[in-house]
UniProtKB/Swiss-Prot annotation:
It comes from the Eukaryota. The lineage of its organism: Eukaryota, Metazoa, Chordata, Craniata, Vertebrata. It comes from Homo sapiens (Human). Putative solute transporter. InterPro entries: EamA_dom (IPR000620), Solute_c_fam_35_mem_F3/F4 (IPR026505). Belongs to the SLC35F solute transporter family. It is found in: Membrane. This is Solute carrier family 35 member F4.
């Protein structure tokens, strides 16, 4: 730029000297060809010959314009983003073919590279920061979700373990109470045979079911309720209005009669048959419940339960055949089957009219049955006493210990059945009931009251298998298929692992020997 100014200054001074030498006093005009900065065309400008000061000022103005042009070109170059097309390359204005334009063109790529480098580094830093922030939040969310999953699994595992423990205890308690009730009845029959009085006496103990439930409520509940308030809350099983006299007679009477009839027939069967046979035949009530539910309630038809019902009927016939169709044996089988049938009818009617009930409602209902039995059924043992059908000499001669033990175990059995539904799985209650069969068999063998032949043993096993088939859920076939498919997948995965392990071993040996072996697998 300095050289350009000196050039212009020498030309102007030489022109002024030439004009003075020629004696030109007027205004002389001189044509000069110059490159105008920032344009592509050659501009011819005529300027008047003025004073040196005016030329210097004009030259300084030109210098200022050239400097501004350089600033704008640099800013336009440095503002170009990496990878983008610079607008100066597409504009209609080209650079001057001068040393200044050459230096500008040569410096532009350097500026662009510097700008690309700086912007690229900054971009990479920003991207790395964003990625690290995203990775941090994602890792934190994954860790929190994984912790929540672990906690949920631990809670579910804990609840399953607790339910399993409670289920095991309730299975043992249910089977023990039922075996104890049956064996105490057999012992009582040696000195006292009044089955209806025993049924009436044990049913009266059901009144204590609700007080036992309320005692548990006071011991475990955080918000205590008064007995009347809790009684009214549990009486909703009879309807929104609670327990009225009309509902008491309408709902309680048929269920109380069925309850009494079930227990009375069971006690009659124990007089004719052994405890093992009666308990095995009573397990047929599951098959009768399915048949009545299918006919009355229009429940889903299941082929496996039909098979279980057929097995139960087969076991009944074989049990009657075990003693060569002896009269007492046939009558005892009829009593036991009648007890199982009335029990099934009780359950089906309860489901039809009252639906499902929680623990408090069940306690209220059973206590109501005991209260109805005490008021309305008490005349029956009185009539049997005076007609000498069930007669005893005096109340002091009654076996009160056996009677209270039988009634207490029967009440415990009913409480455990309803508590078990709350604390554990309902299927375990049924398993506890069917386990009473081998329990009674063990006691009978110890007492040497029964000799098991092949027919009786086969009948007992068939009835128990049919009872267990009744416990299968409705989607048992789908669950079985899923289980089989999962086993197949596990076997296939193990086979793949067994195939890949030798390949890894071969690769390790090949690399150790300096060669690479490719297994066929």
């Amino acid at each position: 730029m300095d050289e350009l100014l000196l050039d212009l200054f020498h030309k102007l001074t030489s022109g002024r000297q030439l004009a003075a030498g020629n004696g030109l006093c007027g205004i002389s005009h001189k044509e000069q060809e110059v490159w105008k900065p920032g344009h592509n065309i050659l501009v011819k400008m005529r300027k008047e010959d003025k004073s040196l000061v005016w030329l210097i000022h004009s030259t300084l103005a030109r210098y200022t314009q050239v400097t501004n042009f350089l600033g704008t070109s640099r800013s336009s170059v440095t503002r170009c983003k990496p990878g983008a097309n610079c607008p100066s390359s597409h504009s209609g204005i080209s650079r001057q073919l001068s040393p200044l334009s050459v230096t500008e063109d040569s410096s532009a790529p350097i500026l662009e590279l510097q700008n690309q480098g700086s912007s690229g580094v900054c971009g990479h830093r920003v991207e790395r920061q964003n990625r690290s922030a995203d990775d941090g939040t994602q890792t934190h969310s994954e860790n929190s979700s994984q912790e929540n999953r672990i906690k949920a699994r631990c809670l579910s595992c804990t609840s399953m373990v607790l339910k399993g423990i409670w289920g095991l205890l309730i299975i043992l308690s249910v089977s023990s109470s039922w075996v104890g009730t049956t064996q105490i009845v057999k012992i009582t029959y040696k000195n006292f045979y009044c089955p209806f009085f025993m049924t009436w006496f044990s049913t009266n103990w059901n009144i204590m079911f609700f007080p036992v439930y309320y005692s548990g409520h006071l011991a475990t509940a955080q918000e205590k309720q008064s007995p009347m308030k809790k009684f009214r809350e549990c009486s909703r099983i009879f309807g929104e209005d609670g327990l009225t006299l009309k509902l008491f007679l309408k709902r309680t009477a048929p269920f109380s009669i069925l309850w009494t009839l079930t227990n009375y027939l069971y006690l009659l069967a124990l007089k004719k048959l052994t405890a093992t046979d009666v308990s095995a035949l009573f397990c047929c009530n599951k098959a009768f419940v399915f048949l009545l539910s299918w006919i009355v309630l229009k429940d889903r038809f299941m082929g496996v339960r039909i098979v279980a019902a057929i097995m139960a009927i087969t076991g009944i016939v074989m049990m009657a055949y075990a003693d060569n169709f002896h009269a007492d044996s046939i009558i005892g089988v009829a009593f036991a089957v009648g007890s199982a049938s009335t029990s099934a009818l009780y359950k089906v009617l309860f489901k039809m009219f009252l639906g499902s009930a929680n623990f408090g409602e069940a306690a209220h209902f059973v206590s109501t049955l005991g209260f109805f039995n005490l008021i309305f059924i008490s005349f029956t043992p009185v009539i049997l006493y005076f007609t000498k059908v069930e007669h005893w000499s005096s109340f002091a001669a009654l076996p009160w210990g056996c009677l209270c033990g039988m009634a207490g175990l029967w009440l415990a059995f009913n409480i455990l059945v309803n508590v078990g539904v709350v604390l554990t799985y309902p299927i375990l209650i049924s398993i506890g009931t069917v386990l009473s069969v081998p329990g009674n068999a063990a006691v009978d063998l110890l007492k040497q009251e029964v000799i098991f032949n092949v027919v009786r043993l086969a009948a007992t096993i068939i009835i128990c298998i049919g009872f267990l088939l009744m416990l299968l859920p409705e989607e048992w076939d789908e669950i079985t298929l899923r289980f089989i498919n999962s086993l197949k997948e596990k076997k296939s995965e193990e086979h793949v692992d067994d195939v890949t392990d030798p390949s890894i071993h071969l690769r390790g040996r090949g690399r150790a020997n300096g060669t690479v072996s490719i297994p066929l697998a």
